[in-house]
């Protein structure tokens, strides 16, 4: 995905309702539905409720990343629950100064709770980033694949599809450019999807019989590896491939708890 010179943000989603739900009920449901207690993740993910508010939710916002920009948009729209994929602690331990201090001020001043789900939202069979992207591409009979921290996080599908057609479908699904390194078959045999930054796993992916690999970003050497392995490698951008899960989860919660939701779009260009 082409790099962007600056961050941009915009809002999408319905905001009409004025109903209310208990934060504890939403959190409990998410923890159970996403199986947080069963799924291992990176330490800095700290999945679940990361910051509480006063206890009530009237509007839900979702975003890929926890950021000042996202919190500012929450405040503008009166949202008091922010659901993210990369949470408050993703950068690791930091002193509460500068950016982190500003983020916490925004959250406290505007009564915003923060809930984060990383791998649990990547691998969920209905709401997950991988399942949602596969659905957006029209892929069916998907199977889980690629073990990470004891669970299968990606999806794969056996489908014969011209690789150029898949490239076009991916561009439409992501509403943006795709970097395509076409060294594999002109018609796909098995497509593997792992959203985000999984390009460095290309050798492991190849061992699972994948001839066409879709992910968000990859190191430089992965393009060389794709050539050596005879694979098609399609990079849609880390951010662009991971908008699906937070959108799907927020929409699901909106329907279940009768509160409105919106997606806060803050593309990073990566």
Region annotations inferred by a language model:
Residues 4-5, 9-12:
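Low-acidity, Ser/Thr- and Arg-rich intrinsically disordered low-complexity segments
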Residues 11, 15-270:
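Active-site catalytic microenvironments in core metabolic enzymes, especially phosphate/sugar-handling
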């Amino acid at each position: 995905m082409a790099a962007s010179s600056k961050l941009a943000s915009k809002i999408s989603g319905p905001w009409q309702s004025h109903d209310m739900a208990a934060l504890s009920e939403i959190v409990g449901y998410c923890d159970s539905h996403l199986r947080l207690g069963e799924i291992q993740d990176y330490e800095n993910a700290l999945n679940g409720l990361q910051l509480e508010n006063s206890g009530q939710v009237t509007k839900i916002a979702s975003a890929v990343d926890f950021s000042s920009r996202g919190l500012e948009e929450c405040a503008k729209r009166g949202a008091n629950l922010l659901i993210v994929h990369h949470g408050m602690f993703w950068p690791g331990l930091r002193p509460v100064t500068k950016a982190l201090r500003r983020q916490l001020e925004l959250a406290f001043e505007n009564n915003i709770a923060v809930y984060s789900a990383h791998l649990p939202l990547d691998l969920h069979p209905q709401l997950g980033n991988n399942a949602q992207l596969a659905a957006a591409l029209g892929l069916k009979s998907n199977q889980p694949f690629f073990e990470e921290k004891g669970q299968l996080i990606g999806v794969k599908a056996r489908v014969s599809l011209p690789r150029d057609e898949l490239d076009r479908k991916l561009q439409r699904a992501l509403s943006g450019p795709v970097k395509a390194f076409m060294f594999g078959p002109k018609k796909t045999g098995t497509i593997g999807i792992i959203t985000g930054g999984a390009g460095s796993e290309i050798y492991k992916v190849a061992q699972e019989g994948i001839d066409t690999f879709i992910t968000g970003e990859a190191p430089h050497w992965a393009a060389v590896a794709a050539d050596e392995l005879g694979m098609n490698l399609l990079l849609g951008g880390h951010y662009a491939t991971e908008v699906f899960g937070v959108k799907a989860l927020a929409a699901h919660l909106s329907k279940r708890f009768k509160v409105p939701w919106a997606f806060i779009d803050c593309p990073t260009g990566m």
